[in-house]
C-alpha cells in the first residue's frame, strides 16, 4: 500500500476515518503529519482491528478502500438516448401492470358474483403484482438506470423488503391455487375450500413472505462512492455481518435460499399438480362422460386449468433468466465489469417485472367473465362515458325478470287448462347449473284446496352473475307467485353454490 498511495493521501484518509468513526478521543489528528508512512499504515490497521464487530470492520474496510483507491471516473453512465429508450420500455410495462391489476382488483371486490374461491387467490396475486410494480419496480428502475440511489436509507430498506415479500407472495399464491385446483379435479368428493379458509391461507402466505424477507429489514444499507473527477454515487445494498456482495457468503446463502423456496420447489410442486390434473382432464374418458352435464363440467374445468397453466408457465419463463444471471454473476465476478452489463441487467429485470403485466392480459384472454368487465371499463374510458354505471346483481335479476314477463304470460293460460294438481311448496334446488332447468313436484289430484303448479327456472345470464329465481303459478287465480327457495350461483367448476342473503 505504501508504494501505491502517497503519504498525503494516507494521512487524509486516516483523518477522515477518525472523524467517520468518532475516534477523536483516541487519535490526535494534529500529530498525524509528523508520522512516517509505516506508522500511518499501522494506525489505519489499528482503526480496523479495534472495531466492535465484524460488520463494523467491513464498514471500515469499505470506507478506507473507497478513500485510498477511488475510481478515476464515475462508471455505468448511459447516454441519454439509451436512457430514454429504457424509460419508454419500462414506463409502458409499469403502466399496463398497474392499470391491469387495478382493474382486476376492482372486478373482484366490486362484483359479488366474482367473489369465488379461485378469484380470491387471483385478487391476492394482483395485489402482490400491484405493490411490486408501484413500490419496487419504479424505484429500482431509476436506481439501475442512473446507477445512483437518491431515495435515502429508509426507503432502501423498504424497497428491498417489498421486493422479496411481493415475489414470495406471488409464487406462494400460485402454489395455493394449484393445490385448490388439484383437490377440486383429482379428488372431487373432498370438501371444497371455503372462503373463510381462503382468507386464512392468504394471511399465512403474507406472514411467511414477511418472515423470509425479514433480513432485508436488518441488513439493508446505503453507501456513497467518490471518484477522482469529483462525482459520486450512492448505492443501496445488503451489508451482512461478513461483508457484502460479491464477497459475503451470507448474502450468497440468503439469495440461494430465496431462489430455492420461491422458484425451485414451487415450480416442481406445481408441475406435479398440473400433470396429475392434466391426466384426469385430458386422459382416458370416464363412464358417462358423454352426458351433457359431465361434458359441460369437464369443459369448464379444462378452461380454468388451462388458464392457470399459462399463468405458471409465464411466471417460470419471466423469472428464469433473472435467477440464472445472478447465479452466474456470483461465480463470475468479472461479469460486473463488462461493457454491456447494465443493459443485460435491465433486460433481465424488465422480463421478470413484466410478469405482473402479463397476468391481467391472461385473465382477459382466457376468462369470459373477466373479459366482459375489462371490455366494459376499457370501452368506458375510450368513449368517455363517465356516467356509465354497472348493474348490481340484484338489478340484473330484476331486469331478467322483466324480460321474462312475456314468456310467463303465455304459459299462464296453459297452466290454467292443466288438470294436474300440485300443492304450493318449496322447489328443490337442482344439482347442476345448466342454462335453463325446470323442476316440478306433483301430488295426486284432490289432495288440497289451494292448488298451484310450481316451476323453478334456474336461468344463468351471459355473465353468470345473477342468482336463479323460482316462480309459482297459481291455477285458481291464474297469477304467478314467488316461491321461497334457496338462491344458488355457479362456481368456477360450473357447480351450484348456495348463497346467503348477504351474498345475493
Swiss-Prot record:
Glycosylation sites: 12, 28, 36
Ranges annotated as biased composition (Polar residues): 395-404, 416-450
Top-level taxon in the UniProt lineage: Eukaryota
Record region (Disordered): 393-450
Gene Ontology MF term list: neuropeptide receptor activity; tachykinin receptor activity
InterPro entries according to UniProt: GPCR_Rhodpsn, GPCR_Rhodpsn_7TM, Neurokn_rcpt
GO cellular component, one term: membrane
Compartments where located: Cell membrane
Annotated transmembrane regions: 85-108, 119-143, 156-179, 200-224, 251-275, 309-330, 344-367
Cytoplasmic-facing ranges: 109-118, 180-199, 276-308, 368-504
Extracellular side of membrane: 1-84, 144-155, 225-250, 331-343
Protein keywords: Cell membrane, G-protein coupled receptor, Glycoprotein, Membrane, Receptor, Transducer, Transmembrane, Transmembrane helix
One of the GO biological process terms: G protein-coupled receptor signaling pathway
Lipid bilayer topology: Multi-pass membrane protein
Tissues with expression: Expressed in central nervous system, as well as in subsets of neurons in each segment of the developing ventral ganglia.
Pfam families, per the entry: 7tm_1
PANTHER family for this protein: G-PROTEIN COUPLED RECEPTOR TKR-1-RELATED (PTHR46925:SF2)
Role noted for this protein: Receptor for tachykinin-like peptides.
Family: Belongs to the G-protein coupled receptor 1 family.
Name recorded for this polypeptide: Tachykinin-like peptides receptor 86C
Annotated source species: Drosophila melanogaster
Amino acid at each position: 500500500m505504501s508504494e501505491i498511495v502517497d503519504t498525503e493521501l494516507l494521512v487524509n484518509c486516516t483523518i477522515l476515518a477518525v472523524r467517520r468513526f468518532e475516534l477523536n478521543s483516541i487519535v490526535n489528528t494534529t500529530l498525524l503529519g509528523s508520522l512516517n508512512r509505516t506508522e500511518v499504515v499501522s494506525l489505519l490497521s489499528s482503526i480496523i482491528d479495534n472495531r466492535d464487530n465484524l460488520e463494523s470492520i467491513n464498514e471500515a474496510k469499505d470506507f478506507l478502500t473507497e478513500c485510498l483507491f477511488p475510481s478515476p471516473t464515475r462508471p455505468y453512465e448511459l447516454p441519454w438516448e439509451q436512457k430514454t429508450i429504457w424509460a419508454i420500455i419500462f414506463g409502458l410495462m409499469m403502466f399496463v401492470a398497474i392499470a391491469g391489476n387495478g382493474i382486476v382488483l376492482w372486478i373482484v371486490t366490486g362484483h359479488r358474483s366474482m367473489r369465488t374461491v379461485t378469484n380470491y387467490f387471483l385478487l391476492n396475486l394482483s395485489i402482490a403484482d400491484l405493490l411490486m410494480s408501484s413500490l419496487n419496480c419504479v424505484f429500482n428502475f431509476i436506481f439501475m438506470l442512473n446507477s445512483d440511489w437518491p431515495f435515502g436509507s429508509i426507503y432502501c430498506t423498504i424497497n428491498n423488503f417489498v421486493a422479496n415479500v411481493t415475489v414470495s407472495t406471488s409464487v406462494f399464491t400460485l402454489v395455493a391455487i394449484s393445490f385448490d385446483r388439484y383437490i377440486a379435479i383429482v379428488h372431487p368428493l373432498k370438501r371444497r375450500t371455503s372462503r373463510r379458509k381462503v382468507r386464512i391461507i392468504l394471511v399465512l402466505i403474507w406472514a411467511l413472505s414477511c418472515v423470509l424477507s425479514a433480513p432485508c429489514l436488518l441488513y439493508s444499507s446505503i453507501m456513497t462512492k467518490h471518484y477522482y473527477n469529483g462525482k459520486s454515487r450512492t448505492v443501496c445494498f445488503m451489508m451482512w455481518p461478513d461483508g457484502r456482495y460479491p464477497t459475503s457468503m451470507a448474502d450468497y446463502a440468503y439469495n440461494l435460499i430465496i431462489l430455492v423456496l420461491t422458484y425451485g420447489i414451487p415450480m416442481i410442486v406445481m408441475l406435479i399438480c398440473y400433470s396429475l390434473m392434466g391426466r384426469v382432464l385430458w386422459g382416458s374418458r370416464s363412464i358417462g362422460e358423454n352426458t351433457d352435464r359431465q361434458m359441460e363440467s369437464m369443459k369448464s374445468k379444462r378452461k380454468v386449468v388451462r388458464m392457470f397453466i399459462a399463468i405458471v408457465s409465464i411466471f417460470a419463463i419471466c423469472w428464469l433468466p433473472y435467477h440464472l444471471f445472478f447465479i452466474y454473476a456470483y461465480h463470475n465476478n468479472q461479469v460486473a465489469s463488462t461493457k454491456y452489463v447494465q443493459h443485460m441487467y435491465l433486460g433481465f429485470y424488465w422480463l421478470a417485472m413484466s410478469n405482473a403485466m402479463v397476468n391481467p392480459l391472461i385473465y382477459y384472454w382466457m376468462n369470459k367473465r373477466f373479459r366482459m368487465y375489462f371490455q366494459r371499463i376499457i370501452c368506458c374510458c375510450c368513449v368517455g362515458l363517465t356516467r356509465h354505471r354497472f348493474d348490481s346483481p340484484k338489478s340484473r335479476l330484476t331486469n331478467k325478470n322483466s324480460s321474462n314477463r312475456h314468456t310467463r304470460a303465455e304459459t299462464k293460460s296453459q297452466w290454467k287448462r292443466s288438470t294436474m294438481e300440485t300443492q304450493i311448496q318449496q322447489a328443490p334446488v337442482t344439482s347442476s347449473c345448466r342454462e335453463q332447468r325446470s323442476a316440478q313436484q306433483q301430488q295426486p289430484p284432490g289432495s288440497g284446496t289451494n292448488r298451484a303448479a310450481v316451476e323453478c327456472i334456474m336461468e344463468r345470464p351471459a355473465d353468470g352473475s345473477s342468482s336463479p329465481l323460482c316462480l309459482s303459478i297459481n291455477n285458481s287465480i291464474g297469477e304467478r307467485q314467488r316461491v321461497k327457495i334457496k338462491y344458488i350461483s355457479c362456481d368456477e367448476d360450473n357447480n351450484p353454490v348456495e348463497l346467503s342473503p348477504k351474498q345475493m
